[in-house]
Curated annotation (Swiss-Prot):
This is ATP-dependent permease MDL1. ATP binds at residues 475-482. The keyword Transmembrane applies. Residues 97-407 form the ABC transmembrane type-1 domain. SMART domains: AAA (SM00382). SUPFAM superfamilies: ABC transporter transmembrane region, P-loop containing nucleoside triphosphate hydrolases. The chain crosses the membrane at residues 96-116, 158-180, 266-282, 353-373, 381-401. Belongs to the ABC transporter superfamily. ABCB family. Mitochondrial peptide exporter (TC 3.A.1.212) subfamily.
Length: 685
């Protein structure tokens, strides 16, 4: 619909052109380029517990099974393919978009017909005034205007039809806006769900290296899920509508301008080449700047998430000022990038506005001369100027459409980077086995963490653990004890060698099904916000109350849970007032694992925060599980109280080699054993 400014302009122009004298100066009002403020959110990230640290500018030292992680730079895709790739994201909403476009065409048709109608109304009114002056008839019949026909209709019928047309236009405009907003919200919801699901399906290589080769951090992933998807949604919903509307308005407006006056149209068309060229260069620059801004926002979110998670450490070391300084640096990076965009946008829109104003003045001057020559009527010039405003606005709108499209492509590149990244380890392929029966064997294992290719962990490692055995892995920090659990859980695949359970190589098994048979408790367990019961049911959703109580008893968590005001319904998590101690968290985490009834239980310093009494009770319960149910127990420990409860001790040296293997008493009684050397060096407590 035409805004009030255009109606005011047409009235002022009509009154001034009756005498074909002085022409008032008309200011063109350009639309402000508003930025879209993106919402932020905090998502809980599930990260695999890897002992590796992410180092920049490193690459995976893998078995070469994946070509997608090649270090060779991919060729830059063509702009056309990038646009079609972006548009394909909206394919599921194609029906809604189709109906929205029908509403858009209807609204645009009504709007584009209005200038011609206004011109005819002006000419009809002017003709009446001229007739009155010629006839000097002051007692004009009141019914005379009704006899004047506008587009073949009497004036009452014409204005009634015009009112109906306005109602239809308003209704279709409502439908357009509602449908496109619906498309945008559906699109962003689907993208966020798809991205989150894709991230959870990734392996540890993704977090250690990822598409960037420097590792994927939680803050950057949050930015891509929350911010980039919003930009894409805007680019594919309202922006597409604005672009199509600009095309329709521009084409129809140009056609009607040619119909009214081809001479004025020729003058108007001279501004199109420079405007289109400027828009093209501006869009290319904006695309790069938009991607840079989104990357800066990702870096800031990453720093925010990291520092807020460690606020107690920051306060302990009194480093608030230095942390704020580093955070301000991230804000400064975003500010500088945004100011570059602001300067570019200011130059682009101010130049376009200047060209538009000069063009309008030129058209008015030339139009008044054509009226004086009798080639145009006042109504024709009014219609032409309104169509000129429409066409000029459409050209500017196309520039803004192209700009927003480039922003969408910049954000889509970061989203596609995650969507198209293929994990090295599939979660769904492979066979499913009902039971994990047999011994665990590591045969000729070579392994290096992908983020530390220069530091090998294992070289030709051979390890045999019998089914139902209670084994403890000991050694100095960094000797590869936790890496054994990482490989057994298949967070990583070895570069060489195989890992078998019975006759099954674990790489041949369905990963999700395989992990459902394992139990893994970390030294620093992650408990989700919610109740204690909800956290335990995370291990087994359909667990009965009897199974929950049994798991609580085995982990000795029932000892403190029953003293809580709300028992199992007690809210826990960082956002709640009820906080658990380290030992209590470990016991809840152990209960969450034991409720799955795993056949292989891996404890990575799982009782390190427990007091001696609680640890003794928990270890006694786990030993009973080992003896009565045949659960294979693999402990990784530095505490002597945990080590001595194991049937077999496997000692690693700093190079990741097994140097001793035997019972606790045998190794402890040998004064020259590596085990005793670890005790003397206080590597074991």
């Amino acid at each position: 619909m035409i805004g009030m400014n255009r109606l005011i302009f047409s009235k002022a122009f009509t009154s001034s052109c009756k005498s074909v004298g002085k022409v008032p100066f008309a200011k063109s009002i350009t639309r402000a380029n508003t930025r879209y403020f993106k919402p932020t959110s905090i998502l809980q990230q599930i990260r695999f517990n890897s002992k590796s640290s992410t180092a920049p500018n490193t690459e995976a030292n893998s078995n070469g099974s994946t070509n997608s992680q090649s270090d060779t730079k991919k060729p830059r895709p063509k702009l056309t393919s990038e646009i079609f790739k972006l548009l394909r994201l909206a394919k599921p909403e194609s029906k809604l978009i189709f109906f929205a476009l029908i509403c858009l065409v209807t609204t645009s048709a009504t709007s584009m017909a209005l200038p011609l109608m206004i011109g005819k109304i002006i000419d009809t009114t002017k003709k009446d005034d001229d007739d009155d002056k010629d006839n000097d008839n002051d007692d004009k019949d009141d019914t005379q205007p009704s006899d004047k026909l506008i587009f073949g209709l009497p004036q009452p019928q014409f204005y009634s039809a015009l009112g109906v047309l306005f109602i239809v236009s308003a209704s279709t405009n409502f439908g357009r806006i509602y449908l496109l907003r619906s498309v945008g919200e559906r699109l962003v919801a689907r993208l966020r769900s798809r991205l989150f699901s894709k991230i959870l399906a990734q392996d540890a290589y993704f977090f250690d290296l990822g598409p960037s080769k420097t590792g994927m951090k939680t803050g950057d992933l949050i930015s891509r899920i929350a911010s980039d998807t919003q930009i894409i949604s805007k680019s594919l919903s309202m922006n597409i509508s604005d672009g199509i509307r600009a095309i329709i308005s521009g084409c129809v407006g140009l056609s009607m301008m040619c119909y009214v006056s081809w001479k004025l149209s020729l003058c108007m068309s001279l501004i199109f080449p420079p405007l289109i060229t400027m828009s093209w260069f501006y869009g290319r620059k904006i695309k790069a700047l938009s991607k840079l801004i989104q990357e800066n926002i990702g870096d800031m979110t990453k720093v925010t998430e990291e520092k807020l998670n460690g606020v107690k450490v920051i306060q302990t070391f009194s480093q608030q000022q230095s942390v704020v300084h580093s955070y301000n640096q991230e804000i400064k990076n975003i500010f500088n990038s945004s100011m570059r965009e602001a300067k570019l946008a200011g130059f682009f829109y101010s130049t376009n506005g200047f060209i538009g104003n000069v063009t309008m003045i030129g058209l008015l001057i030339m139009g008044t001369k054509l009226i004086g020559a009798g080639e145009l009527t006042v109504g024709d010039l009014s219609s032409f100027m309104m169509y000129a405003v429409y066409t000029g606005t459409s050209v500017f709108g196309l520039g803004n459409f192209y700009t927003e499209l480039m922003k969408g492509i910049g954000a889509a590149e970061r989203v596609f980077e995650l969507v198209e990244y293929q994990p090295r380890i599939s979660n769904h392929l492979g066979k499913k086995v009902d039971e994990l029966n047999g011994d665990i064997e590591f045969k000729g294992i070579d392994f290096t963490y992908p983020s530390r290719p220069e530091s090998g962990i294992f070289k030709d490692l051979n390890l045999h653990i019998k089914q139902g055995e209670n084994v403890c892995l000991v050694g100095p920090s960094g000797s590869g004890k936790s890496t054994v659990s990482q490989l057994l859980l298949r967070f990583y695949d070895p570069e060489k060698g195989t890992i078998q359970i019975g006759d099954d190589v674990i790489t041949d098994l369905n990963l999700n099904h395989y992990r459902s048979k394992l139990g893994y408790v970390q030294q620093e367990p992650l408990l989700f916000s919610g109740t204690i019961k909800e956290n335990i049911l995370f291990g087994k959703e359909d667990a009965t109350d009897e199974e929950i109580n049994n798991a609580l008893n085995l982990s000795y968590a029932s000892n403190f849970v029953r003293h809580l005001p709300d028992g199992l319904d007690t809210k826990i998590g960082a956002s709640n007032s009820t906080q658990l101690s380290g030992g209590q968290k470990q016991r809840v985490s152990l209960a969450r694992t034991l409720i799955r009834d795993p056949k292989i239980l891996i404890l990575d310093e799982a009782t390190s925060a427990l007091d001696s009494v609680s640890e003794e009770i928990v270890m006694s319960n786990l030993i009973q599980l080992n003896k009565n149910r045949g659960v294979t127990l693999i402990s990784i420990a530095h505490r002597l109280s945990t080590i001595k409860n194991s049937d077999r001790i496997i000692v690693f040296n700093q190079d990741g080699q097994i140097v001793e293997d035997g019972k606790f008493n045998e190794l402890h009684n040998d004064p020259n054993s590596q085990f005793n050397k670890l005790l003397k060096s206080h590597s074991l407590e």
